[in-house]
């Protein structure tokens, strides 16, 4: 199964100290410069090695490194690095595509949680994800380009439903993800 193979490959790289060639050493990466990263990537391609999924390693991790709290960094980065947690992206929405200013998925504050309602589309391999990093509207009164927040949501949270989208080739590599009163801790 593709998901198991990719997780296993990430674990092998991690065990050899190569789990994140693009990460700084302070976060468990190699700390390599761009040239060494490129040479490593070329060797992996030449050896027909599996890919490393970008969602955790190259998309959410750099955001956490730059803007996350110390608690978020210690909670999420090691599990991304060793392949324990699989991530997917929650940006696009039906009828909006990648126009983030028009996103409609809402996250309303309720005490120390957000309550998320809405739908995301074109979530690559989301059916295998443990977590989704999601853009949500937290201030509907703000200009469309503002009032948007970045939440980290556990895919096992009650109220989440993943529906595969059949592609022209018959595969199910993308999904729609529905959020129905999904409670997310404010610290995420």
Question: What does each model-found stretch correspond to?
Answer:
Residues 17, 40-45, 136, 152-157, ...:
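Short Ser/Thr-interspersed hydrophobic loop/turn segments at strand-loop and sheet-helix junctions
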Residues 105-108:
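A structural signal for short hydrophobic beta-strand segments in well-ordered beta-sheet cores
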Residues 83-91, 135:
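A short, Trp-centered hydrophobic/proline-enriched beta-strand micro-motif
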Residues 7-84, 124-131:
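Internal helix-loop-helix
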Residues 102, 156-183:
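Flexible, small-/acidic-enriched active-site or ligand-binding loops
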Residues 95-103:
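Active-site-adjacent elements of ketosynthase-type condensing enzymes
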Residues 97, 121-126, 168-169:
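Glycine-rich phosphate/pyrophosphate-binding beta-alpha loops
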Residues 113, 117-161:
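A short core secondary-structure module
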């Amino acid at each position: 199964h593709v998901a198991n193979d990719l997780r296993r490959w990430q674990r092998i790289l991690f065990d050899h100290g190569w789990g994140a060639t693009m990460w700084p050493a302070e976060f468990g990466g190699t700390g390599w410069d761009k040239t060494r990263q490129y040479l490593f990537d070329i060797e992996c391609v030449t050896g027909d090695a599996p890919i490393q999924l970008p969602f955790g390693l190259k998309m959410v991790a750099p955001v956490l490194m730059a803007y996350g709290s110390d608690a978020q960094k210690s909670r999420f980065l090691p599990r991304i690095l060793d392949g324990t947690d699989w991530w997917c992206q929650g940006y696009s929405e039906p009828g909006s595509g990648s126009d983030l200013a028009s996103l409609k998925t809402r996250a309303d504050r309720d005490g120390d949680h957000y309550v998320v309602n809405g739908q995301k589309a074109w979530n690559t391999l989301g059916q295998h994800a443990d977590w989704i990093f999601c853009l949500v509207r937290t201030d509907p009164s703000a200009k469309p380009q503002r009032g948007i927040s970045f939440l980290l949501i556990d895919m096992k949270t009650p109220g989440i439903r993943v529906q595969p989208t059949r592609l022209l080739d018959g595969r199910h590599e993308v999904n729609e993800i529905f959020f129905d009163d999904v409670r997310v801790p404010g610290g995420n």
